[in-house]
Amino acid sequence: IPYSVNNVNVVYDGRNEASGHATGIDFKLYGEFVPNTNSWITLSLMNTKMNLNGYSIPLPTDQRYAINLFYTDYFPGTDKWKLSLSLSYADGLPFSTPHNEYGRSSFRAPAYKRADVGMSYRLVNNTFKEKPNVFKNVWLGIECLNLFGINNVNSYYWITDVSNQQYAVPNYLSGRLLNAKITFEF
């Protein structure tokens, strides 16, 4: 069933007049570069298209590639302080003008880019006790999400002027945010 996305509203055509495919593969390299920490890198390759009226049209979810990195390390000389870094880069999603959802005039939003950094302090460490308390570890942390304040596009709001010309005005995802957290490990 063909569908389109108008702003953030998914609109289904209601007639099963298209065929399509969704293919992809994910690669993940996981490891502990530093003992007792998590680090990984992923590469995702994807392709989603529908065939409608003789045209091959990318679906609204057609993000062709994504690369993500997550790295964790302890501060030198202590395992009470931990630093984490997360990087993301992904292809932009396809869009088209309203009332032309299945047309060939679709375009792509800019690539998604984001960097997060965080720091945590271990409040409780019961990892090596024979009979630990309820929690294995308790961490208190602070994070800066979207460190560089990149304006990543979520969707477009379309404005039509008096001469029937349409303009795409981007709706952005959250800017830079500070986040405090507490993590309980069982």
Predicted regions and their residues:
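Outer-membrane beta-barrel transmembrane domain signature
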Residues: 107-116, 120-122, 186
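Outer-membrane beta-barrel translocator domains and adjoining extracellular loop/strand segments
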Residues: 1-5, 46, 50-58, 95-102, ...
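Gram-negative outer-membrane beta-barrel transporters
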Residues: 4-94
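C-terminal beta-signal and adjacent terminal beta-strands/loops
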Residues: 89-98, 121-186
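Surface-exposed loop/turn segments flanking beta-strands in extracellular/periplasmic regions
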Residues: 1-14, 160-169
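Residues on the lipid-exposed face of transmembrane beta-strands in outer-membrane beta-barrel proteins
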Residues: 25-31, 69-73, 117-121, 142-144, ...
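Residues that define the transmembrane beta-barrel architecture of outer-membrane proteins
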Residues: 19-23, 61-67, 111-115, 136, ...
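Outer-membrane beta-barrel domain signature
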Residues: 14-18, 56-60, 104-108, 131, ...
